[in-house]
Amino acid sequence: MTDHTPLQPKHEITDQADQDTSAEMLVEEEDKKEIGPNYITEEEAQEIRLRALAEMENFKKRLQKDHDEQIRYAIDNLLTDMLPVLDSLDLAIQYGSNDDACKDILMGVSMTRKLFLDTLKQYGVTVLGEINEPFNPELHEAIAHEEREDIPEGHVSTLHQRGYQLYERLLRPAKVSVSSNKNNSNTNK
């Protein structure tokens, strides 16, 4: 038998095994000291899990809301580009109403305008700006003040250009003149 390992006394082997075991125990104790306070309880783990699930659910809802809003307002730019066409129809009706020769054409333009407005309404567009309605700076753009006895102060006295709104989003404010009473103007001067 040729064994190249040197022979060691038995007591040396057990001393070395004891040293290895005690070294492992020291390392485990060190690990426990480092990791021990960082352990979480089952209740804490459940709470963390529930919070993560709630955050994920809120994130999904935000994504869905953003997606729905993008779809809802996808026609925003198209509608804004179409508003001058509607303005032209309004002007044709306004100026054609004074000429009897344009009566038949005026009827066709009026029908086209109504059809156009009905279609816009189906897509969530509302028309803004009526004479005698209260002035609202969020929906109206005041371009002048007029002294008017027949319209209450702070109300729309003249409509220069209609405004339009897509659901809650303003496409264009109505351009209006706002009434002011003659009596109030003189007392303020």
Swiss-Prot record:
The gene is grpE. Keywords: Chaperone, Cytoplasm, Stress response. GO terms for molecular function: adenyl-nucleotide exchange factor activity; protein homodimerization activity; protein-folding chaperone binding; unfolded protein binding. InterPro entries: GrpE, GrpE_coiled_coil, GrpE_head. Coiled coil: none annotated. It is found in: Cytoplasm. Gene3D superfamilies: 3.90.20.20, Head domain of nucleotide exchange factor GrpE. This is Protein GrpE. GO terms for cellular component: cytoplasm. It comes from the Bacteria.
